[in-house]
């Protein structure tokens, strides 16, 4: 199998992007790049250092002094910030509720996108996020856009939170996910939207395995 194609998986919060992308990357022996984790890592540092999330200059200054590293392991992808393992803490409710506010700043996205493109320059990657197919990797050989209802996405996030031991309330999650959709869709730079050449998959009533199998069919068609 050719090892140099780039697979972009986009979609709104809790549509199943990361879960599916990890499995696809493992099957293809590709590098998995969780762009959302990079924004979460910066958000975590900003919250820790009490940087105002609406202060774009302060955030870009913080980012330029923050080393974010994604590492593969037996347990999956690990996220490090300046040498500290933040894999689990960046999934906290506090970070989750704040990450869209950080990601909407144009200069923050510009710096992150430069880092993401550098990681993907040699191909052999599966990258997920909100704007991979439209902005980060517009020439990706395979582009997928996952979607699901707000209710279904809230249920999934609720189950994830419970599994991680985080406090969780389903009705609150529905509101938060709808709010994040609005912020992500209306932001000035690279808003959440389906690339014209992306294949859309509604995951509301599909299992993870069914979504993975559908994407693998598409990948095999493109590289066959």
From Swiss-Prot:
InterPro entries: Cytidylate_kin (IPR003136), Cytidylate_kinase_dom (IPR011994), P-loop_NTPase (IPR027417)
Keyword hit for Kinase: yes
GO cellular component terms, semicolon-separated: cytosol
One record GO biological process: nucleobase-containing small molecule interconversion
EC id: 2.7.4.25
Pfam families cross-referenced by the UniProt entry: Cytidylate_kin
Gene Ontology MF: a single term: CMP kinase activity
Record has Transferase as a keyword: yes
Keywords assigned by UniProt, alphabetized: ATP-binding, Cytoplasm, Kinase, Nucleotide-binding, Transferase
Similarity comment: Belongs to the cytidylate kinase family. Type 1 subfamily.
Protein name: Cytidylate kinase
Organism this protein belongs to: Geobacillus sp. (strain WCH70)
The gene coding this protein: cmk
């Amino acid at each position: 199998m050719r090892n140099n194609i780039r697979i972009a998986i986009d979609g709104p919060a809790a549509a199943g992007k990361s879960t599916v992308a990890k499995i696809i990357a493992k099957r293809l022996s590709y590098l998995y790049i969780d762009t959302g984790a990079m924004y979460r890592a910066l958000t975590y540092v900003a919250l820790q250092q009490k940087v105002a999330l609406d202060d774009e200059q302060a955030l870009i200054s913080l980012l330029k002094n923050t080393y974010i590293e994604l590492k593969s392991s037996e347990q999956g992808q690990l996220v490090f910030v300046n040498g500290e393992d933040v894999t689990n803490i960046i999934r906290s409710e506090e970070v989750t509720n704040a990450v869209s506010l950080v990601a909407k700043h144009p200069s923050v996205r510009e710096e992150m996108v430069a880092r993401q493109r550098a990681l993907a320059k040699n191909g052999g990657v599966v990258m997920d996020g909100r704007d991979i197919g439209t902005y980060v990797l517009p020439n990706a050989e395979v582009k997928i856009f996952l979607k699901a209802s707000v209710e279904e996405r809230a249920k999934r996030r609720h189950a994830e939170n419970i599994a991680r031991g985080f406090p969780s309330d389903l009705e609150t999650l529905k509101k938060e996910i709808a709010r994040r959709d609005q912020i992500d869709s209306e932001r000035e730079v690279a808003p959440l939207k389906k690339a014209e050449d992306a294949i859309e998959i509604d995951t509301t009533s599909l299992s993870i395995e069914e979504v993975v199998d559908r994407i693998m069919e598409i990948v095999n068609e493109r590289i066959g």
